[in-house]
């Protein structure tokens, strides 16, 4: 905790967040600062690179501090700033800049659980038809019409669990306002080490200190539902 609170110019920052309202207030400028850059880029490869510079990671998937809620908040914030189009379906309609993560493998398309794509107009077409662009392991960019994608979700924020194996320049790690069995030192470590340059941890001191003192426990169905 001393490192987080007194990090100065180091790569770790602590932000005390005690209520959902405080979280939403803190998110407002963070979302604008983190995602404006990629939303102004037309080239798919450059947009994907800019998008991956910043990520919001949540310990939970559900609840006011979870990835689902933060994704909804992010869309509302970006809409109010006219950075994305109107999306009344809350993540289930398509607009320029929508980031999506595949949640079910489709071997015929070569798209797999955890793959992230960006929705953009075809830069070489006059009709501005939207495609979702993915970068594969070789660095090549592939595109798909939105209706062809397997199961997916909007991904301005993602769970720590889903972020494993990924790295970003800057990370915000959001902890819940109360303790859960899945809050372990391994989860905190995973969240912190997703950042190449800077990580900002948002939460309460009791939740963080309890998590750091707990080693990973055996999984359960409820744990997986909250975690993923």
Feature locations, PLM:
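Conserved helicase motor core of P-loop NTPases
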Residues: 1-100, 106-109, 120
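Short hydrophobic-aromatic micro-motifs
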Residues: 56, 101-102, 173, 201
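C-terminal accessory regions
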Residues: 115-228
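N-terminal start-of-chain detector that recognizes signal peptides
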Residues: 27-30, 71-72, 89-92, 103, ...
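Structural motif
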Residues: 59-61, 104-105, 176-178, 204
